[in-house]
């Protein structure tokens, strides 16, 4: 039996597993940090420590498809975004990640955000009520960072709808 010295130590036990288990292992998500990704993680982490102000900074990350943007977001959430209960027994969700709606629709964006809080809502509720619920949840759960993935979906549709959604994000 070989000691598999050519295999990274952490992965040596995998070599002894069945073919099915090794293939499953190969298909699992794995984080491989690289300088640009680590820089982005550091920048996002910095946002978590900023004091509140009327217009908080924002960040738009652009790159070609399948370049790892969502993987970076998921890694950031894994490191810093998990919810917890604070000293006052209040639930805290420091980071909320939502998928942008497939079209620039303010109501759909609010529903996507509310869904992440597991808050009940009715699809037929007026936009103003959904907006109120979103703002309430963001404050209640002390959200420091709202990440909207696949923002390019919001660039479809008429310029008026795009502006409406962009104003909602502000």
Question: Could you say what each language-model-derived stretch is?
Answer:
Residues 147-170:
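Conserved Walker B catalytic segment
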Residues 1-57:
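A short, basic N-terminal segment
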Residues 56-60, 95, 145:
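Residue-level preference for the first positions of well-ordered beta-strands
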Residues 135-144:
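Short basic/glycine-enriched coil/helix segment immediately N-terminal to the Walker B
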Residues 53-75:
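Walker A/P-loop nucleotide-binding motif
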Residues 79-89, 119-120:
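Post-Walker A helix-loop "phosphate-sensing" segment adjacent to the P-loop in P-loop NTPases
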Residues 101-136, 155-160:
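Short glycine-rich substrate-engagement loop in P-loop NTPases that contacts/grips substrate
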Residues 76-77, 87, 99-106:
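A glycine-rich, hydrophobic loop/mini-helix early in the fold
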């Amino acid at each position: 039996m070989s000691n598999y010295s050519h295999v990274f130590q952490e992965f040596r036990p995998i070599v002894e597993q069945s073919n099915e288990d090794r293939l499953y292992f190969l298909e699992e998500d794995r984080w491989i940090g690289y300088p640009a990704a680590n820089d982005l993680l550091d920048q996002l982490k910095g946002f978590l420590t900023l004091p509140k102000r009327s217009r908080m900074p924002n960040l738009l990350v652009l790159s070609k498809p399948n370049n790892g943007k969502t993987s970076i977001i998921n890694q950031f959430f894994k490191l810093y975004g998990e919810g917890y209960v604070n000293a006052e027994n209040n639930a805290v969700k420091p980071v909320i990640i939502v998928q942008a709606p497939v079209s620039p629709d303010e109501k759909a964006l609010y529903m996507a955000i509310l869904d992440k809080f597991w808050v009940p809502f009715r699809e037929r509720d007026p936009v103003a009520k959904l907006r109120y619920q979103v703002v309430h949840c963001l404050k209640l759960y002390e959200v420091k960072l709202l990440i909207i993935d696949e923002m390019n979906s919001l660039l479809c549709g008429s310029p008026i709808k795009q502006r409406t959604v962009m104003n909602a994000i502000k």
